[in-house]
């Protein structure tokens, strides 16, 4: 799952100009996706991110900024700044004045706890839990992925989250394309 915020603006986003405005050299654009009625930018912070951020523009003056709920702790802390900066870049002012109050340390803890609980619930009935915005195509976690680390459904939330981050940082989660090739023989 992911968390997202809407920003209303009456101008198109020039993503390269936004990156310059942010003055964060570690921000890297991974790819842009375009449909007839929307634009999507996917990016990460080099050396910090374990999942992708996204900005989605529906071509009707609304931007949706989102982050995967299993993102790194540092990215979850960075997320309100990203929303604030995009709003100021597009509108010259903060469109969401409660962003820092809402997305605080308590929100980070609740987001991680809720997402790990969702992961546990999913893995009790399904063999794979797919990340919402992975760095690699269709990355997922399974009980088999966690077992070598002594992690299972009864492990604590910090332990599960910690090993998930370890695997994601090393880009060691299996991907659906890996699974498909092993099934096809």
Range-by-range predicted roles:
Residues 108-185:
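Aromatic/basic-lined ligand-recognition segments
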Residues 89-119:
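Acidic-leaning, charged glycine-interspersed low-complexity segments
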Residues 1-4, 60-62, 79:
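A general secondary-structure signal for short beta-strands and their flanking turns/coil
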Residues 10, 15-28, 65-100:
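Ampiphathic alpha-helical segments that act as solvent-exposed interaction surfaces
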Residues 22-74:
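Short, intrinsically disordered low-complexity segments
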Residues 1-35, 127-147:
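Short, extreme N-terminal segment that most often corresponds to the first beta-strand
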Residues 22, 41-43, 55, 65-67, ...:
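Extended hydrophobic/Leu-rich segments
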Residues 1-2, 36-37, 87-91:
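A short, compositionally biased
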């Amino acid at each position: 799952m992911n968390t997202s915020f809407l920003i209303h603006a009456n101008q198109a986003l020039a993503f390269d100009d936004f990156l310059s405005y942010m003055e964060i050299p570690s921000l890297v654009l991974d790819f842009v996706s375009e449909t007839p009625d929307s634009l999507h930018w996917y990016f990460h912070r080099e050396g910090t991110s374990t999942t992708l951020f996204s900005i989605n523009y529906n071509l009707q003056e609304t931007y949706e900024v989102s982050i995967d709920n299993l993102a790194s702790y540092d990215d979850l802390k960075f997320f309100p700044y990203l929303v604030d900066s995009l709003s100021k870049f597009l509108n010259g002012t903060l469109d969401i004045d409660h962003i820092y109050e809402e997305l605080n340390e308590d929100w980070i803890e609740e987001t991680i706890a809720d997402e790990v609980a969702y992961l546990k619930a999913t893995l009790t009935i399904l063999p794979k839990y797919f990340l919402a915005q992975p760095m690699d195509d269709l990355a997922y976690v399974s009980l088999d992925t966690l077992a070598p680390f002594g992690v299972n459904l009864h492990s604590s939330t910090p332990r599960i989250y910690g090993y998930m981050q370890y695997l994601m940082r090393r880009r060691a989660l299996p991907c659906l394309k890996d699974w498909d090739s092993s099934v096809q023989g």
